[in-house]
Amino acid sequence: MVTTPATLASRVFAVDRRAAERVDVALWVRVRVQGQPEHPARIANISRTGFMAMTPCPVFDYAPVLVELPRIGWVRATMLWSLGDRIGGEFEQLMQPDDFAKLRPFFI
């Protein structure tokens, strides 16, 4: 299989984003999916690039969502995967270090 440089570069970028330091947290949030009512979720780990959460409500892969983070507010994300009640999302924008530091009280 031949990989073009552009494709390879995008894959390297994706791996770099996934490799961001993840922190275990106990963080109750609200999630909004377009066309659905708000629903609760518990974020189990978070990084400046994304999160893994549990929620009883179905969220489709690649759905755009809003996540309300305490001390930060509503943040845009894209759901990348779901497995049972677990979901994984990527923030639309890299979370700034100052904002990430606001979540420290929730670190486990």
Task: Name what the model sees in each region.
Residues M1-I108:
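Structured alpha-helical
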